[in-house]
Amino acid sequence: MSMFCFQCQETAKGTGCTIKGVCGKTADVANLQDLLLYVMKGIAINSLQARELGIVRQDVDKFVMEGLFATITNANFDNARFVALVREGLALRDSLKADIVKAGGVLPANLHDSATWTADSAEEFEQKAAQVGILATENEDVRSLRELLIYGLKGMAAYAEHAFALGYEDNSIFAFMMKGLAATTDDSLSADQLVALVLEAGKYGVDVMALLDKANTTSYGNPEITKVNIGVRNNPAILISGHDLRDLEDLLKQTEGTGVDVYTHGEMLPAHYYPAFKKYAHFVGNYGNAWWKQDKEFDSFNGAILLTTNCLVPPKDSYKDRLFTTSVVGYEGVKHIPAREAGKVKDFSAVIELAKTLPAPTEIETGEIVGGFAHNQVFAVADKVVEAVKSGAVKRFFVMAGCDGRMKSRDYYTEFAKALPQDTIILTAGCAKYKYNKLALGDIGGIPRVLDAGQCNDSYSLAVIALKLKEVFGLDDVNQLPISYNIAWYEQKAVIVLLALLYLGVKNIHLGPTLPGFLSPNVAKVLVENFGIAGITTVEDDVNLFMGA
């Protein structure tokens, strides 16, 4: 069986995975993801018509949000889960059509196939999936723009899901997801119209990150400067990875007083910066590094492991039986924690009971790392920052947000951080931080040279900080600030962050370690000519370029 996927930075040969995903997903899972997307496009077409009639169904919006999230890189590898999602999607789509008719609407005679096709067996799903994948769009520029839009929607959906878990939603974001998905079925749209939609996705990218920022800070307080322990204690423990702060809250409540410690991994590290989580004495610290090192770090952790969102790597047998997934995450043979019931906490008792029987983590490092520099914290020391710029103590800021990954070429970011002049400050968010957040880079007048705002969605904080600095310095354009953007990308959340920055007018962003394989030469040219998007070269040449040497 063949497949085609080029949504992540590590895609085979930089052009696409065709036999098995570099991420580990099989061809049948990749194809079922394509089919689920196809069904959701049909749902979106019907949803747009329903909305015109005043019909807004939260169950439909939630399904599309979670369905998009489930197809993100390293989220779900479970064939059976996707078969079930396709069936659920078809049923929802048809019930939505019934609502339209009941409300007096007339279904168009020429509905796109995605809004009418139906089947029930896994065999029929397999046959259809082979016909509706990425390569079904023959024009490479149209294909490139459609996929760029879809990947932006996937990132948007991930952030919307985190906000939704905390009780925050925005109907306009859901409506745009539907508009965007439906647009990818419309062969009448020109390249210019698709480019406009991609940029509109950036607008909603800003909105969804602002919504999630509000959800997180209202629920847990504003992140504050925090020292995070990276050593271990001698108690049984649970390692929580992913991004879902509501899951962390539920887990901390349920483990309190049990003798089980809780550690974060990967993108969950910034949870330590939120005031609400500091009251838990058993919330010990952060264990390990970025997602791609989990094959070794999950092994040495010894305890139970909970994956709340991506990034999951196909697990080794040595820890598979102590791994749990929840939410959109899934892997065949790995225990899954069901969704929380309305008004209740998610039941993590199975994770906790297993953890009690397991040995304490093996120590892999000691010390502390510092973070918590989201917009509110930076504004609290804004006078200090502004004075440092005016005095010349700080010559330039470098936004190095984004993702980490397996490729050896990503060592560039470690060396780049080391090579930056001492009068520069790195602003970061996302797991890209692990390339340099444990280096001794010092400080400038008490301001650490690495300011970590948080998770990848906290790139929003970096944008807010830039806009505030523009205002403070009385500039007309954010690009007049002494800020350079050298961003590492890996998956689709980085795509929506990029589109959000473009919407905010940020230009001359450098993207690496490679440019996306889903950008056709012509689409890449549009981004280069209109926004100054560029790749990376060597550390020395890039530092000189950014510093104007």
UniProtKB/Swiss-Prot annotation:
| UniProt cofactor note | Binds 1 [4Fe-4S] cluster. Binds 1 hybrid [4Fe-2O-2S] cluster.
GO MF annotation, one:
4 iron, 4 sulfur cluster binding
- Gene Ontology cellular-component terms listed: cytoplasm
Residues that hold hybrid [4Fe-2O-2S] cluster according to the record: 243, 267, 311, 403, 431, 456, 491, 493
Mind listing the UniProt keywords for this protein, alphabetically? 4Fe-4S, Cytoplasm, Iron, Iron-sulfur, Metal-binding, Oxidoreductase
| Listed Pfam families | Prismane
Query: Could you say which residues bind [4Fe-4S] cluster here?
Result: 5, 8, 17, 23
The question of whether Protein transport is a record keyword is answered with no
Q: What is its main location?
A: cytoplasm
Q: Which residues carry this modification: Cysteine persulfide?
A: 403
Cofactor names:
[4Fe-4S] cluster; hybrid [4Fe-2O-2S] cluster
> Do you know which Gene3D superfamilies this protein is assigned to?
1.20.1270.20, 3.40.50.2030
Q: What is its EC number?
A: 1.7.99.1
Q: What does this protein do?
A: Catalyzes the reduction of hydroxylamine to form NH(3) and H(2)O.
UniProt protein name: Hydroxylamine reductase
| Gene name in the database record | hcp
